[in-house]
Amino acid sequence: AFIWGGYSAFALTAVFSLILWWGLILSSLATPEGELFTEKMDRLHRSAYQLQVSEDGTRLKIQGEITFGFSNNFLQALKDHPGLKTIVLNSQGGHIYEARGAAKSIQDKGLNTHASRECSSACTLLFVAGRKRSLAPGAKIGFHQYALSFGNSLPNLDLQKEQEKDLAFFQSQGVKLPFLNRMFQHSSKTLWYPEYQELIDSGFLNSPN
């Protein structure tokens, strides 16, 4: 099982589980000739998001779900475009582990982050990893508790500890404690959208629009 940080995860994972189950039986019906099942699933995952580089090569736009394989493809995009300076985000979230991998790449390379419309749940890990963090007018940032993609519990996985791990990362990026204490108060079925001034005062945003 995997940890998801996107409020659309419940519906999406239900659909995904059906795709996976039927795909094992009927994959040949919708699979190009010669395509392996693993290749098909990678293609489906890639279709959930877009990575688009600006004409001048300085901005990489991420749009869609942060899903399986995302962090590797994101890192490859960074390698292919060494002139990138800013990551532009529009995502409702997705897979926490994939988001952590991408966030580390952003932090290591000292890239800036900018939310163009919405950056919620797992997407906020990418956002807070930025050196300079800004928000477009009307854009929003959303937070909620983590949830499992399948089932309600796993014996070796503590969601509270996973949240604490990411809270420590947020704090290391300059986000203040009162804000951190509110980040995971909402259930995984709802979202907390802080006001713009709250984001500024907390240190979550640190650059003008």
Label each residue range with its predicted role.
Residues 62, 87, 127, 199:
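Terminal peptide-recognition signature
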Residues 107, 111-147:
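Glycine-rich beta-to-alpha active-site loop
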